[in-house]
UniProtKB/Swiss-Prot annotation:
Top-rank taxon, per record: Bacteria
InterPro entries reported for this sequence: Fe_traffick_prot_YggX, Fe_traffick_prot_YggX_sf
Family: Belongs to the Fe(2+)-trafficking protein family.
Name used for this protein in its record: Probable Fe(2+)-trafficking protein
GO biological process, one term: cellular response to oxidative stress
Keywords for the protein's UniProt record, in alphabetical order: Iron
A molecular function GO annotation: iron ion binding
Function: Could be a mediator in iron transactions between iron acquisition and iron-requiring processes, such as synthesis and/or repair of Fe-S clusters in biosynthetic enzymes.
HAMAP family reported in the protein's UniProt record: Fe_traffic_YggX (MF_00686)
GO cellular component, one term: cytosol
Amino acid sequence: MSRMVQCVKLGHEAEGLDRPPYPGALGARIYQEVSKEAWQGWLKHQTMLINEYRLSPIDPKSRTFLEKQMEAYFFGDGAQSPEGYVPPAPQDS
């Protein structure tokens, strides 16, 4: 049976993550309060941030920026989008 959490991002109970997705206290908090669905939303947002800002996940400044954005995405007022960012149009299957 799946572990259920009261997801802070979605605002309802949903399937929880299998393990903490990030080290430290932030990872533990995400594990306790964020659903798999919301985590997938973060991964898409993080990919957009990395691409638009040309971040390197191995650069300490980039990692600090992404960590702050992750915390804001789940527990704050929401993560930022790059100025002028327009999401790609949905593709027809």
